[in-house]
């Protein structure tokens, strides 16, 4: 079977999570691309009403599963937790803040071909959404990954639709650079990768941790592990 598992980590996303889940659920319920689907929501120790909202949603909509962490684990561990527990043939990880609305997955599904293994949502409107510092960080992240590995990760921080078996082997990276490594390793192994141009949205509530110095340093040091792909 061709089944899709949508993975949504969330932390204090009560303002957006209901819209995110409902719109993705409707899209997949109407779509004929996959034989079956489910939406797995990881509440990573939210302090607001996120858990109550998604619990209520799971009673109204079918094919929704909830994982609840009592204590926040952080975005990296939340990603890994979702990837590790996934069981369907295809997985798609998106955010609970609606920066990647359901129309992005819809765009990918409209361009879906069975002979591709990984679809990368390539954000074409970064200059409209990001401020200057965020643009610089995004540019150098991609450039640094390319210089270290010799392979273009396309848009390393963006969402992806991929076959679960691409994650069967352990990754070298130990932090957020794993997102880039997934694309780099997939291309290096000769699998087919397709970039889909998309427009993502502003983060309307909360604050991204991507620009924190501690996160940036850890991510860029993590990128150094990509050097192994020069000899892979």
What spans do the regions from the language model cover?
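Cell-envelope/extracellular polymer assembly enzymes that use nucleotide-activated donors
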Residues: 3-5, 38, 181
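Short, well-formed alpha-helical segments that are part of the catalytic scaffolds
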Residues: 13-29
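Acidic helix N-cap motif at the loop->helix transition within catalytic regions
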Residues: 15-19, 48-57
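Conserved donor nucleotide-binding strand/loop of the catalytic core
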Residues: 38-40, 51-85
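A conserved acidic beta->alpha catalytic loop
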Residues: 43-51, 98
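Acceptor/aglycone-binding surface of glycosyltransferases and processive sugar-polymer synthases
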Residues: 69-85, 90-93, 102-176, 203-213, ...
